[in-house]
Structures are given as structure tokens and as C-alpha cells.
Amino acid sequence: MQTEQLLLKIIEQTHLTSSEMQQLFTSIIQGELNPIQLTALLITLKIRGESAEEISGAVAACLNAAQPFPTPDYAFADIVGTGGDSANTINISTASAIVGAACGLKIAKHGNRSVSSKTGSSDLLTALGVNINMPADIARRALDEIGLCFLFAQQYHLGFKHAVPVRQALKTRTIFNILGPLINPARPKRQLLGVYSPHLLKPYAETVAQLGHQHTFVVHGCGLDEVAIHGRTDVAEIYDGKITYYSLSPLDFGFQAKPLESLRGGEPAENAQMITALLQGQGKPEHAQAVAMNTALLMKLFGYENIKHNAQQVLDVIQSGKSVNVLSQLTRY
């Protein structure tokens, strides 16, 4: 089917199949849609909502076009959120990736510039002295040797540049925000994925199930694309294609709820200062709690089933200062 026909189907409120969406998104990545066509597509999808079939088709197109990364044969995971929750918190996922590596996990962190906060994962890591543009073979070596690497989305998904002017002009969340966490070029089968809206939990989980991930958590925590320290976290757990929905509270991790305001972030330099203090074991208790809760769930992907025990173990690792050593090693690649 021609691109124009596929566009017309979407504008007429018809859902595309996965293969149709893959074809259409391949056209976007190759720069074949003009700005008016792309705007119509993005806004129509946003208003009616993207189906799991459509998201999985777009993911397939993006991964097929991505620059290659040598996927490891050992167990590794990613922890990443859609962004776009407008909460402007510290970089919980990035800090959790570093702490997770200090706990002995293998984490290939996929990330980009900021979406809704002042500081995205790549902004923070740059401020911390990490080379976010390291070649794929060097990033893979870091993952092998220290258990952590960062894959900068713009380096691997070159075709996204064709959509940048339209996305900047629209100034609203689109399917591109939804795709980010699902298109890690390392292709992890284990992921902790945060979404900016509770309405995304179900389509995201169904997409993950279609993509054949081994074990994944999709979370939304009281307005955050993270596990929440301030209230309930809605969870979709996908294990070997089966989806289970439930909720978690800070008490499940052994903590009392803390105010969201305590996680407020700032510019990259400010966030880097706060995250460095955290990794040294000298950060705010609320920051340590947020990272402990998210890393505890991340550990469950590797078979550590008791999240309360995991959270305490993470706090011990944070206090030990091991995490800042992992960061220091990463800056040398």
C-alpha cells in the first residue's frame, strides 16, 4: 500500500496493522513525508491513541533502521522512561542504572536529551563527564567490563532527524516519546520501562508482549514515569508473553511515602551535583529511597524476587560508595 493510502487510513480513524505501520514509519525515517503529512499523522495518532499493533510496527521500523550494536549473549537490562511527565525530578532512571551496575547487574542504558525536565539522561551524563557518543564497540566493552554503558538515541536512530522540526513546532508528546524506551539498539529482553500516563500502561504492556521480551515491568507512579516514593505505582509485569497488572506502594519496599517535591531537579550541573552526592552515599535520603525502589524492581528482572530485601541491599551499596566508582570507571571509556 502506498504511503498516502496509509496516511489516509489513519486520518479516517482506521487502525493500521503492525506491518502497515512498519511501512509508514520506515517512510518517516527515510524522510519521505513532508512536514504537513507528518504533522497530520502525529496529531491524529495522538488524539485517537496508538494501538499496540501500531506501536510494535513503528518499533520494528526503528530497530531495523538503527545503527548496529553488538547484543551480548548474557543477561542484561535497560531502565528507561518515556519522559514527558513534566515533573522535573532528578534523573532517577540514570542513577538507578549506575547503582544497578554497582549491585552487579548488567545495564545497557538507552537515553536522549530532555523531553519534559531541564535535564535528560544524556544531559546529566555529559555533566558527569561521560562520553555519551562513544562508539558501539567501546560501549559494549564498558558493558562487559564494568556492567554499564550508555547508548545515545541520536547516535543510533539517525532517521529521527527528519521529524525534529515538526516535533519542535508541535511542542507536545507524540508517538516518538512512546517509542524511545522500546528502541534500545542493544535489544534487551529485560526492561524496567516508565510511562508518563496511566493510560499508556496497557498498550505499552501489550506492545512489549508482542515484541517478545523475556521479563519487563511497565510502571507509572502517581504522575511519574518511575516507581513513586509519594504514592501508588501501577505496574504491568510481562513475563514470557503473559501480562499481570498490580500496584505497589513504598511500604512494599520497606519505606514510608515521601513528598514528590523532595525529588525536584534542576539544570544539568545541579542534577550532576545531587546525583554525585547520592552515589557517594552522601545524598538526600529521599533521593536514595527513590533510587533504591527503582533499582529493587530492576533487580527482580535478574531473579532477585524480594523487593524489600533488594531495596535494603541497594541502600547498603549506595552507602558503600561503590556506585561512584562505577561512574568514575565509565568516564574513562
Swiss-Prot record:
UniProt record, GO biological process: L-tryptophan biosynthetic process
Q: Where does 5-phospho-alpha-D-ribose 1-diphosphate bind?
A: 81, 84-85, 89, 91-94, 109-117, 121
Keywords of the record, alphabetical order, are: Amino-acid biosynthesis, Aromatic amino acid biosynthesis, Glycosyltransferase, Magnesium, Metal-binding, Transferase, Tryptophan biosynthesis
According to the record, cofactor stoichiometry and binding are noted as: Binds 2 magnesium ions per monomer.
The record's InterPro entries line, in alphabetical order, gives: Anthranilate_Pribosyl_Tfrase (IPR005940), Glycosyl_Trfase_fam3 (IPR000312), Glycosyl_Trfase_fam3_N_dom (IPR017459), Glycosyl_Trfase_fam3_N_dom_sf (IPR036320), Nuc_phospho_transferase (IPR035902)
Q: Give the residues the record marks as binding anthranilate 1.
A: G81, N112
Residue sites binding Mg(2+) 1 per the record: S93, E226
Protein residues bound to anthranilate 2: R167
Q: Name one GO cellular component term.
A: cytosol
Give the reactions, separated by semicolons, that this protein catalyses.
Answer: N-(5-phospho-beta-D-ribosyl)anthranilate + diphosphate = 5-phospho-alpha-D-ribose 1-diphosphate + anthranilate
| Enzyme Commission number(s) of this protein | 2.4.2.18
Annotated pathway? Amino-acid biosynthesis; L-tryptophan biosynthesis; L-tryptophan from chorismate: step 2/5
Domain of life (superkingdom): Bacteria
* Quaternary structure and partners: Homodimer.
Family classification: Belongs to the anthranilate phosphoribosyltransferase family.
Give the protein's biological function. Catalyzes the transfer of the phosphoribosyl group of 5-phosphorylribose-1-pyrophosphate (PRPP) to anthranilate to yield N-(5'-phosphoribosyl)-anthranilate (PRA).
Q: Which HAMAP family match?
A: TrpD
What is this protein called in UniProt?
A: Anthranilate phosphoribosyltransferase
